[in-house]
């Protein structure tokens, strides 16, 4: 409103630059004294144009956050297969036993399997679909009951999803997958209801493990028989292999068919199927990264161009005062580099929060993606942002060289 009180002739003239003020850094004397003249001028200019300062930082931080999110989502999706089928599930093959095979017959087959050159360990389990009951709607899950606890670590890695500490499957309670616990909103020592073959059972949760696919409930044989009052009848066998050569696979498959033992499937085949499905997601993520990089370039270019156009008179003045070309470049572009560094660092915080929000939003009830950001996502995002900054500074040198000292100084008149 103050412009309404001014004369038209005054309004036609460009606004005078803001007066310089003491900045916070000047009060920290042991740092301020060690700065050169040009560095002091840069710091003053950064804090003098507060609107541009915040606009630049927010714009750069937003672009950096998008790049971090792109790299982070790619890692979160692509790392799931390796995590699930190498870190969590450690067996190599799964055999679905024929319904006619009894538990005693299964033990006999176990000895025969262990005599095969390809097989290292065999573990029999009950693998059965269950309903996990919750307030609003039931969850589809899988109950896995281990017959033996001796070599269980060879087949599955029971690791606490928060602390990473090893969990022990005992007769006190079940071990629940992390995503399932999150959906049920339960913690260790809570109880939960499961429905098995139409009968409802209440069990205690003794541990919550890291898991990425399906809603798993792990139980010991003693606990299963105690809860259900039924004897355990195994229906699956987990195998760990000495070698995964095709010749060994072919030999084992032939043996299974001859003995009418059951259907054999390999874990790595399941992982490959998921990888093929994820490839289409990779394309979307690459587009996101490219668009975020392009947006970063556009924001930096426009901010730099506006900065130069608004300060033509100032640039002309320092040229008249005898600043060399390199000194003029440093005078303007040093601010861009500092603002880019600050914006990039702030963008890492925004990127972490945005990545966390997106991953939690796109997860399904039976899937949990890797929620942690790998360090390289931050590094790549900062390098891309600073790389664009230096490239734009190089391109905008031509604009600085074209600033006409006489015309820029006369424009005020």
Please identify what each model-predicted range represents.
Residues 73-107, 235-236, 413:
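Membrane-interface junction motifs in transport/secretion proteins
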Residues 88-89, 168, 208-244, 268:
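Small-residue transmembrane helix packing/gating motifs
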Residues 51-76, 341:
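Short, strongly hydrophobic transmembrane alpha-helices
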Residues 6-23, 398-413:
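Short cytosolic juxtamembrane segments of multi-pass membrane proteins
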Residues 73, 77-86, 248-295, 306-310, ...:
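Peri-transmembrane interface segments
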Residues 282, 296-338:
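Interfacial "coupling" helices/loops that link adjacent transmembrane helices in transporter permeases
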Residues 56, 83-87, 107-190, 202-204, ...:
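Short beta-strand boundary microenvironments
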Residues 2, 330-331, 344-407:
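Short helix-loop junctions at transmembrane helix boundaries
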